[in-house]
């Protein structure tokens, strides 16, 4: 049995009942060409999986009214908002709809309830984040806490997941600055 969330890395390998629980709290939304799904600086409200159509992820470079830098063109099956789903931080990029279609929306509030009630989901998300963080270049794994991350031995709490997301966001910002300069 396949679901639209099977392609999301931190949901891979979850048992079917857990996937179905997550799917039960999602909503399908129509998206219109030329509109933004969300904008850089908006409050994060959840994760979006592109079911049909196309979207473009971009950031504003420099001052208001300045140019934009395209980070990615998204096709059906791809997703945005995974960090915001967990940490609730403001959106770090904007997403423009370039071809009308549909997205599957997973609200952050509903997902938090799923994680509270399904430890297997919380563990899968935490393991995925540990894997992402441990794969970052230029990070030294010498402290006891860093070793826990590297060994995926982190308690799957929302607080720990937010910390892992923060590390990823900081790394992404530093990478963007290095690419700019």
Language-model features and meaning:
Residues 57-58, 82-83, 93-97, 113-114:
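Short beta-strand His + acidic residue motifs that chelate non-heme Fe in jelly-roll/DSBH
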Residues 18-21, 90-92, 109-160, 164:
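A small-molecule sensor/coupling module
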Residues 63-80:
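Short acidic-glycine-tyrosine-enriched beta hairpin
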Residues 101-106, 110:
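A short hydrophobic beta-strand segment most commonly corresponding to one strand
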Residues 157-181:
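Intrinsically disordered, low-complexity charged/polar segments
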Residues 47, 73, 105:
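Short aromatic/basic micro-patch
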Residues 5-61:
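Regulatory nucleotide-sensing modules
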């Amino acid at each position: 049995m396949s679901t639209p969330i099977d392609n999301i890395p931190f949901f891979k390998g979850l048992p079917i009942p857990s996937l179905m629980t997550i799917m039960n709290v999602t909503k399908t939304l129509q998206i219109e060409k030329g509109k933004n799904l969300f904008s850089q600086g908006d409050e994060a409200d959840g994760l979006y999986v592109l079911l049909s159509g196309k979207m473009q992820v971009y950031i504003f470079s420099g001052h208001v009214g300045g140019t934009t830098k395209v980070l990615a063109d998204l096709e059906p099956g791809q997703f945005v908002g995974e960090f915001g789903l967990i940490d609730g931080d403001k959106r770090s990029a904007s997403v423009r709809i370039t071809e009308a279609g549909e997205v599957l929306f997973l609200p952050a509030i509903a997902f938090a309830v799923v994680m509270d009630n399904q430890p297997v989901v919380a563990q899968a998300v935490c393991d995925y984040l540990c894997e992402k963080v441990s794969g970052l270049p230029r990070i030294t794994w010498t402290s006891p806490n860093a070793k826990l991350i590297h060994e995926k031995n982190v308690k799957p709490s929302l607080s720990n997941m937010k910390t892992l997301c923060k590390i990823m966001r900081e790394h992404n910002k530093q990478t963007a600055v290095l690419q700019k300069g």
